[in-house]
Amino acid sequence: MVRAKRKLDHIEYALSTGQSRTHGFHDIEFVHQSLPNSSYETITCETKIGELSLSSPIFINAMTGGGGEKTLHINEQLAYVAKHHNLAMAVGSQMAALKDESEAASYKIIRKVNPNGIFFANLGSEATVEQAERAVDMVGANALQIHLNVIQELTMPEGDRDFTGVLQRIEEIVLNSKVPVIVKEVGFGMSKETMQQLASVGVTAIDIGGQGGTNFAAVENERRQRMLSYFNNWGIQTATSIIEATSTNNNLSFIASGGIQTALDVAKAIALGANTTAFAGYFLRILMEDGIEKLVDEIDLLHTDLKFIMTALGAKTIEELQSVPLVIKGETYHWLTQRGIDTTHYSRR
């Protein structure tokens, strides 16, 4: 019951605290092209994460599950939206269902709604190989997300305090998993050092989960008597984390998430090097406040606007969008300079 109550608390406080929008994309500007030699009607948006082919560079990221009927209904609606738009979708952490079988229905519902969809299972970095296998089987997953959430756990009143052995556990899961493993942050971003460590143990896909969206330190602080306010502004902004990712020069696929709300955010994330982008808090707010049809319409508009932007830039495919010139300014440029990451190739390609 404690875990289920926490799941419901997370939904409530995620909606009430909102998204910070401190993702850093305001520091990224495209170089205008007056002769793009492109046509809106021929723009294609297919992309890949590793060996997984996706019809869109937008997918529905992990949100919830394991909180009884309310979370079942949310996942049911999200699965419908994913089916309508042929989007990939991740479920929230399944540890609740591994510990309490009665909660499994709130995750399994997605396959009932969308039998042929692409779904990602989800567990924390404390998971064992056996738990990872059960989570994948529970939803017939095409991939497994392992989330890293140190700051959230430290801020959580009942959270973990021991993070030793995490890389070794991830390596064991990667070696034994029958589906691709995606390691993701939950809103605090990833450094190039972390990504290099993950690549060294065989991880091939990373969701950078940057600062700028739902702030889980702020969410957990709402649940505390004594706030750990120093964690509320902790992390690496989404735009910065994408560039840190691409600077590693590893053969990794990258998912950009963290405050992404617009087609321009999507285009900038991909142009910086992401293979796809993920929405969570923004979609949840629309669903909860305006309903499922409004969310369906919003995703239609996102795809339309993304194709407009790609047409303006002369990028006929997602791969071409990854090579358009752009300029990095402001705090993002300052951070990257201090970190020894050269940005000139973005503006001169």
UniProtKB/Swiss-Prot annotation:
Any idea which positions bind substrate? R6, K7, Q152
Write down the InterPro entries for this protein, in alphabetical order: Aldolase_TIM (IPR013785), FMN-dep_DH (IPR000262), IPdP_isomerase (IPR011179)
Which CDD domains does the record cross-reference, listed alphabetically?
Answer: IDI-2_FMN
Q: Which UniProt keywords apply?
A: Cytoplasm, Flavoprotein, FMN, Isomerase, Isoprene biosynthesis, Magnesium, Metal-binding, NADP
- Biological source species: Bacillus anthracis
A GO MF term: magnesium ion binding
Q: How does it assemble?
A: Homooctamer. Dimer of tetramers.
Q: What is its main location?
A: cytoplasm
Q: Which cysteines are joined by disulfide bonds?
A: none
Its family remark reads: Belongs to the IPP isomerase type 2 family.
NCBIfam families for this protein: IPP_isom_2
A GO biological process of this protein is: isoprenoid biosynthetic process
Q: Which GO terms describe its cellular component?
A: cytoplasm
Query: Which residues of the sequence carry a binding annotation for FMN?
Result: A62, M63, T64, S93, N122, K184, T214, G258, G259, A280, G281
Q: Spell out the reaction equation it catalyses.
A: isopentenyl diphosphate = dimethylallyl diphosphate
Q: Which purpose does this protein serve, as stated in its record?
A: Involved in the biosynthesis of isoprenoids. Catalyzes the 1,3-allylic rearrangement of the homoallylic substrate isopentenyl (IPP) to its allylic isomer, dimethylallyl diphosphate (DMAPP).
| Record's subcellular location | Cytoplasm
Q: Please identify the protein, giving its name as recorded.
A: Isopentenyl-diphosphate delta-isomerase
Question: Gene encoding it?
Answer: fni
List the EC numbers from the record: 5.3.3.2
